[in-house]
Amino acid sequence: MSKKVLILSGSPRKGGNSDILCNEFARGAQEAGNEVEKIRVASKKVHPCSACYYCRDHGGACVHNDDMAEILQKMIDADVLVLASPVYFYSIDAQLKAVIDRTVARWLEVKNKEFYYIVTMADTDESSADTTLACFRGYAEC
């Protein structure tokens, strides 16, 4: 059965390692018969969450007028979410973290999907990715 796969490439570098792996994931998912869309988060305008809770009182609408409403709707509509980030100081890059934070008002519509993670880093010690993976897992299991 075909699934809607949304890949969020958090890397600020187009053609960087994370972005290349996103393209390979997309290719494999398409070859398996799935509908795939990849969004390069760095190419979108996404303000960080202000924690003003406007969204809580306005049906999930955000005070920021940017590309996040479109991204969030695609996240809600997807069956599978792929989150990709380079490891920056043992965590997710700022671009993808802003997207994650901005899902707060409609999180119940995002959770309970299949999640996959693509993590890249320059460090040869695999444990350096542990905190980043914990952030991703915490988000998915919230």
Describe each region flagged by the PLM.
Residues 1-84, 90-106:
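N-terminal beta1-alpha1-beta2 submodule of the flavodoxin-like/Rossmannoid cofactor-binding fold
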Residues 25, 88-90, 116-117, 136:
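Aromatic side chains
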Residues 87-89, 122-123:
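Short glycine-rich anion-binding loops that position phosphate/pyrophosphate groups of nucleotides
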Residues 107-142:
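Short, glycine-/small-residue-rich phosphate/pyrophosphate-handling segment
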